[in-house]
Regions:
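Glycine-enriched, solvent-exposed interface loops adjoining structured elements
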Residues: 1-216
Protein backbone atom coordinates (compact mmCIF):
# COMPACT_ATOMS: atom_id res chain seq x y z
CA UNK A 1 0.00 0.00 0.00
CA UNK A 2 1.20 3.53 -0.78
CA UNK A 3 1.43 6.07 2.03
CA UNK A 4 1.85 9.83 2.08
CA UNK A 5 5.11 10.52 3.92
CA UNK A 6 3.76 13.62 5.66
CA UNK A 7 0.90 11.57 7.09
CA UNK A 8 3.44 9.10 8.44
CA UNK A 9 5.45 11.95 9.96
CA UNK A 10 2.35 13.01 11.88
CA UNK A 11 1.81 9.47 13.15
CA UNK A 12 5.42 9.24 14.29
CA UNK A 13 5.00 12.52 16.19
CA UNK A 14 1.95 11.06 17.92
CA UNK A 15 3.90 7.90 18.84
CA UNK A 16 6.70 10.03 20.28
CA UNK A 17 4.31 12.22 22.26
CA UNK A 18 2.24 9.33 23.60
CA UNK A 19 5.26 7.39 24.82
CA UNK A 20 7.35 10.22 26.23
CA UNK A 21 6.54 11.03 29.84
CA UNK A 22 9.83 12.64 30.82
CA UNK A 23 9.95 15.75 28.66
CA UNK A 24 7.96 17.45 25.88
CA UNK A 25 8.89 16.50 22.34
CA UNK A 26 10.13 19.97 21.49
CA UNK A 27 12.71 19.69 24.26
CA UNK A 28 14.14 16.44 22.95
CA UNK A 29 16.69 18.32 20.89
CA UNK A 30 17.85 21.77 19.92
CA UNK A 31 16.00 21.75 16.58
CA UNK A 32 12.75 23.50 15.82
CA UNK A 33 9.47 21.69 15.19
CA UNK A 34 10.21 21.77 11.46
CA UNK A 35 13.68 20.27 11.88
CA UNK A 36 12.29 17.45 14.01
CA UNK A 37 9.78 16.68 11.25
CA UNK A 38 12.64 16.61 8.77
CA UNK A 39 14.54 14.20 10.99
CA UNK A 40 11.48 11.96 11.17
CA UNK A 41 11.10 12.00 7.39
CA UNK A 42 14.78 11.13 6.94
CA UNK A 43 14.36 7.99 9.07
CA UNK A 44 11.19 6.55 7.50
CA UNK A 45 12.76 4.69 4.56
CA UNK A 46 15.52 3.21 6.74
CA UNK A 47 12.99 2.13 9.36
CA UNK A 48 10.80 0.55 6.68
CA UNK A 49 13.77 -1.35 5.27
CA UNK A 50 14.71 -2.78 8.67
CA UNK A 51 11.15 -3.83 9.44
CA UNK A 52 10.72 -5.40 5.99
CA UNK A 53 13.89 -7.42 6.54
CA UNK A 54 12.85 -8.66 9.98
CA UNK A 55 9.10 -9.21 9.58
CA UNK A 56 7.67 -12.69 8.95
CA UNK A 57 6.61 -13.55 5.40
CA UNK A 58 2.93 -13.45 6.40
CA UNK A 59 3.14 -9.68 7.00
CA UNK A 60 5.02 -8.65 3.86
CA UNK A 61 2.17 -8.38 1.38
CA UNK A 62 2.19 -9.35 -2.31
CA UNK A 63 5.55 -7.87 -3.28
CA UNK A 64 6.64 -7.48 -6.91
CA UNK A 65 7.25 -10.05 -9.67
CA UNK A 66 10.74 -11.24 -10.56
CA UNK A 67 11.16 -11.39 -14.30
CA UNK A 68 14.10 -11.91 -16.56
CA UNK A 69 16.01 -14.52 -18.49
CA UNK A 70 16.90 -17.83 -16.84
CA UNK A 71 20.45 -19.01 -17.45
CA UNK A 72 21.29 -22.73 -17.38
CA UNK A 73 25.00 -23.43 -16.79
CA UNK A 74 24.53 -27.04 -17.91
CA UNK A 75 23.69 -25.75 -21.37
CA UNK A 76 20.46 -27.76 -21.31
CA UNK A 77 17.19 -25.98 -20.47
CA UNK A 78 15.44 -27.36 -17.41
CA UNK A 79 18.34 -29.54 -16.30
CA UNK A 80 20.42 -28.88 -13.21
CA UNK A 81 20.68 -25.47 -11.57
CA UNK A 82 19.88 -22.08 -13.01
CA UNK A 83 20.15 -18.42 -12.14
CA UNK A 84 18.30 -15.14 -12.72
CA UNK A 85 19.61 -11.57 -12.42
CA UNK A 86 17.63 -9.82 -9.68
CA UNK A 87 16.28 -6.25 -9.87
CA UNK A 88 18.54 -3.49 -8.51
CA UNK A 89 16.01 -2.74 -5.77
CA UNK A 90 15.84 -6.32 -4.48
CA UNK A 91 15.62 -6.52 -0.68
CA UNK A 92 14.18 -9.91 0.18
CA UNK A 93 12.71 -12.97 -1.52
CA UNK A 94 9.00 -13.49 -0.98
CA UNK A 95 8.61 -16.76 -2.88
CA UNK A 96 10.21 -18.74 -5.70
CA UNK A 97 9.10 -21.99 -7.31
CA UNK A 98 9.94 -23.71 -10.56
CA UNK A 99 7.20 -25.71 -12.28
CA UNK A 100 8.71 -29.10 -11.40
CA UNK A 101 9.23 -28.29 -7.71
CA UNK A 102 6.96 -29.75 -5.06
CA UNK A 103 7.16 -26.65 -2.85
CA UNK A 104 7.78 -22.92 -2.97
CA UNK A 105 10.90 -21.45 -1.29
CA UNK A 106 11.05 -18.24 0.73
CA UNK A 107 14.12 -18.84 2.91
CA UNK A 108 17.39 -18.32 1.10
CA UNK A 109 21.08 -19.00 1.67
CA UNK A 110 24.15 -17.07 0.48
CA UNK A 111 27.64 -17.99 -0.69
CA UNK A 112 28.92 -18.05 2.90
CA UNK A 113 26.46 -20.71 3.99
CA UNK A 114 27.79 -24.27 4.49
CA UNK A 115 24.76 -25.45 2.53
CA UNK A 116 25.87 -23.40 -0.49
CA UNK A 117 29.05 -25.44 -0.94
CA UNK A 118 26.95 -28.60 -1.09
CA UNK A 119 25.10 -27.28 -4.14
CA UNK A 120 28.32 -27.55 -6.15
CA UNK A 121 28.86 -31.20 -5.23
CA UNK A 122 28.98 -33.82 -7.98
CA UNK A 123 26.72 -35.99 -5.85
CA UNK A 124 23.08 -35.30 -6.69
CA UNK A 125 21.75 -36.69 -3.42
CA UNK A 126 23.08 -33.81 -1.32
CA UNK A 127 22.08 -30.94 -3.62
CA UNK A 128 18.76 -29.19 -3.88
CA UNK A 129 16.20 -31.04 -5.99
CA UNK A 130 12.53 -30.71 -7.00
CA UNK A 131 11.44 -32.33 -3.72
CA UNK A 132 13.73 -30.23 -1.51
CA UNK A 133 14.75 -27.18 -3.56
CA UNK A 134 17.35 -24.65 -2.45
CA UNK A 135 17.54 -20.97 -3.40
CA UNK A 136 20.64 -18.81 -2.93
CA UNK A 137 21.07 -15.06 -3.29
CA UNK A 138 24.60 -14.51 -4.56
CA UNK A 139 26.58 -11.44 -5.59
CA UNK A 140 27.95 -11.75 -9.11
CA UNK A 141 29.94 -9.19 -11.05
CA UNK A 142 26.72 -8.16 -12.79
CA UNK A 143 24.75 -7.73 -9.55
CA UNK A 144 22.71 -9.98 -7.28
CA UNK A 145 21.59 -13.27 -8.80
CA UNK A 146 19.02 -15.78 -7.61
CA UNK A 147 20.50 -19.25 -7.99
CA UNK A 148 18.08 -22.17 -7.79
CA UNK A 149 18.84 -25.84 -7.23
CA UNK A 150 17.64 -27.68 -9.13
CA UNK A 151 15.41 -28.90 -11.96
CA UNK A 152 14.88 -32.09 -13.94
CA UNK A 153 11.85 -31.33 -16.15
CA UNK A 154 13.78 -30.34 -19.25
CA UNK A 155 12.56 -27.98 -21.96
CA UNK A 156 9.01 -27.76 -20.59
CA UNK A 157 10.25 -26.03 -17.41
CA UNK A 158 8.80 -22.68 -16.37
CA UNK A 159 8.72 -20.38 -13.36
CA UNK A 160 5.58 -20.98 -11.30
CA UNK A 161 6.12 -18.29 -8.65
CA UNK A 162 8.71 -15.54 -8.34
CA UNK A 163 8.08 -12.49 -6.16
CA UNK A 164 10.27 -10.23 -4.05
CA UNK A 165 10.16 -7.32 -1.63
CA UNK A 166 11.74 -4.14 -2.98
CA UNK A 167 13.93 -1.74 -1.02
CA UNK A 168 11.50 0.92 0.26
CA UNK A 169 12.07 4.35 -1.22
CA UNK A 170 10.39 7.73 -0.89
CA UNK A 171 9.29 8.96 -4.31
CA UNK A 172 7.16 12.04 -4.95
CA UNK A 173 6.39 12.27 -1.23
CA UNK A 174 5.09 8.70 -0.99
CA UNK A 175 6.41 5.32 0.14
CA UNK A 176 5.03 1.81 -0.39
CA UNK A 177 4.90 -1.13 2.02
CA UNK A 178 2.40 -3.66 3.40
CA UNK A 179 -0.40 -2.14 5.47
CA UNK A 180 0.23 -4.91 8.02
CA UNK A 181 3.59 -3.30 8.78
CA UNK A 182 2.50 0.32 9.04
CA UNK A 183 2.33 0.52 12.84
CA UNK A 184 5.65 -1.29 13.27
CA UNK A 185 7.34 1.10 10.83
CA UNK A 186 5.85 4.13 12.61
CA UNK A 187 7.18 2.92 15.96
CA UNK A 188 10.57 1.94 14.57
CA UNK A 189 10.89 5.37 12.98
CA UNK A 190 10.01 6.92 16.35
CA UNK A 191 12.66 4.72 17.96
CA UNK A 192 15.32 5.91 15.50
CA UNK A 193 14.35 9.55 16.07
CA UNK A 194 14.41 9.12 19.86
CA UNK A 195 17.85 7.54 19.62
CA UNK A 196 19.08 10.75 18.04
CA UNK A 197 17.19 13.30 20.10
CA UNK A 198 16.55 11.81 23.54
CA UNK A 199 18.68 10.75 26.50
CA UNK A 200 15.85 8.80 28.14
CA UNK A 201 16.87 5.16 27.70
CA UNK A 202 13.52 3.84 28.95
CA UNK A 203 11.68 5.97 26.39
CA UNK A 204 13.92 4.73 23.59
CA UNK A 205 13.66 1.10 24.71
CA UNK A 206 9.87 1.30 24.94
CA UNK A 207 9.55 2.43 21.32
CA UNK A 208 11.82 -0.36 20.09
CA UNK A 209 9.94 -3.00 22.07
CA UNK A 210 6.61 -1.84 20.66
CA UNK A 211 7.95 -1.97 17.10
CA UNK A 212 9.25 -5.51 17.62
CA UNK A 213 6.02 -6.64 19.24
CA UNK A 214 4.08 -5.53 16.18
CA UNK A 215 5.97 -7.91 13.86
CA UNK A 216 5.78 -11.05 15.99
Amino acid sequence: MQYNVQDLVKEVRVALDNNNSSEPLLQLGDGSTLSINEIIESKIADAARIILQEAPISLLGEGSPISGKIYWPSGEIGKGWGHILLPDNFLRLLCFQMSDWDISVSKTIDENSPQYALQKSRYNGIKGNPQKPVVAIVSWGTGLHLEFYSCTAGSNISVRKARYIAIPKIEAGKITFSEKLKSAIVYYTAFMVAQELSRDENFIKSLLEQAKELIK
